[in-house]
């Protein structure tokens, strides 16, 4: 995969070399390049922003340096791939979006600053992505989150290919509780089933606990989840347990 990033602060992406992304680069699974689009300004002051027409607070990123930087990337690579604009008004980023992006050969991220963008920049964009209902100073942190979540899904990036498939959200549910040695720590014991060596029972326990955790913490994820008969039975059990606790408090 090739990832291009347009940013006014390329040094902010240094930490990526210390992470899973860095390992992907070392393995030649990923080629990542950061371009400072200030280098493509045509004014003497090297300004990349200007006041908005019609008045208003703040400054807007100009279209010209972004367009010229994108043209340069396209000339070098033959294409831009999917061009992603980090924007609070964009599509909310989640695991399904990461999985979608991980199937692409080329991604280009535009990281903005200031009050916003000249609207004409959006004409070059294929995807607008938001991390949530909040505003960051710039798009760099958002881009790093999207890149990390996407790159770890590429084949052979993680040491164990099952690591990504077993993550929270990958199966539509939160991840089940996990334990390591010792089996008893300050009176807190590892569930006996995990010590049994019975892989079928362990798999069933994990599935049930994954569903339980999702039911308790992120019930919204279950709205589009397709339940098996066994899972429906577990849900009824969770409901009964919930009712008992509520009435017990009363």
Curated annotation (Swiss-Prot):
Keywords: Cytoplasm, Methyltransferase, S-adenosyl-L-methionine, Transferase, tRNA processing. It is an enzyme of class 2 (transferase). It is found in: Cytoplasm. Transmembrane segments: none annotated. S-adenosyl-L-methionine binds at residues 112, 131-136. The keyword Transport does not apply. Specifically methylates guanosine-37 in various tRNAs. This is tRNA (guanine-N(1)-)-methyltransferase. The gene is trmD.
């Amino acid at each position: 995969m090739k990832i291009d990033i347009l940013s006014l602060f390329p040094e902010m992406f240094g930490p990526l070399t210390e992470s899973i992304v860095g390992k992907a680069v070392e393995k030649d699974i990923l080629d990542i390049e950061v371009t400072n689009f200030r280098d493509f300004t045509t004014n003497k002051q090297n300004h990349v922003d200007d006041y908005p027409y019609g008045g208003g607070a703040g400054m807007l990123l100009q279209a010209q340096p972004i367009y010229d930087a994108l043209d340069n990337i396209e000339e070098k690579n033959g294409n831009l791939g999917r061009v992603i604009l980090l924007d609070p008004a964009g599509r909310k980023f989640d695991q399904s979006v990461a999985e979608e992006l991980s199937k692409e050969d080329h991604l280009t991220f535009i990281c903005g600053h200031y009050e916003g963008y000249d609207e004409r920049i959006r004409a070059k964009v294929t995807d607008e992505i938001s991390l949530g209902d909040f505003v960051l100073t710039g798009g760099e942190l958002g881009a790093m989150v999207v890149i990390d979540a996407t790159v770890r899904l590429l084949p052979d990036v993680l040491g164990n290919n099952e690591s990504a498939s077993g993550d929270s959200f990958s199966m539509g549910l939160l991840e089940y509780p996990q334990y390591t040695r010792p089996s008893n720590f300050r009176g807190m014991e590892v569930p006996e089933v995990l010590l049994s060596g019975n892989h079928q029972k362990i798999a069933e326990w994990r599935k049930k606990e994954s569903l339980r955790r999702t039911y308790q913490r992120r019930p919204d994820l279950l709205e589009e989840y397709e339940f098996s008969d066994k899972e429906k039975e577990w849900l009824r059990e969770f409901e009964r347990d919930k009712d008992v606790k509520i009435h017990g408090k009363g």
